[in-house]
Amino acid sequence: MSEAVQKDAPFWLTGNFAPTFTEHTETTLKVTGHIPPELNGRYMRNGANPETGESVHWFAGNGMIHGIELANGKANWYRNRYVRSPILKDSGADGTEDPRTQSLANTHIISHAGKILALEESHWPYELSPELETIGAYNYNGKLETGMTAHPKVCPETGELLFFAYGMVPPYLTYHRASATGELIQSEVIDVKGATMVHLSLIHI
């Protein structure tokens, strides 16, 4: 499905990294080997897929979700869909949207409290249907006033979603906590002297 778009393009625009320009739904899938019948569910991945075929940086393409559904030893479907934020050309945006909706939504995808969310580092997440269709920007019923990191963590004991947001203007850093049922229950500004990029990693010791 991918194709090289420029002869001397950077690696993220060529070969296996090259963007695909078509949204597919395939229900006749060839399986090589054997899918365990107890392996049921949907696997989804998110990544940058610039709709123009050009991108100045690996992280700057529009978000595209790829997904496959497995059930009873079969692969029922594969599909890929753009995350339809106002950044996408055919989104119907008219320029009056809240700036926090201006997300590429191209970095990560999570499932929490019955919601499937496509994430990036600076804006609100985007909620998707189980079939990968875009539902819209998600802000916890208006309670999330900042953006949301692309790398939240789920507490293994409480099921709460822990995340933060950082920005170029105050508040520079805000910590958030959502309950296991998906309610935003805590937002705390963390006092820092200025804007800084914060990137969370999980380290096992």
Regions of interest found by a model, annotated:
Residues T28-T52, F163-V192:
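Amphipathic repeat-derived elements
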Residues S55, K115, D191:
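Short, charged/polar micro-motifs that form catalytic or ligand-binding hotspots
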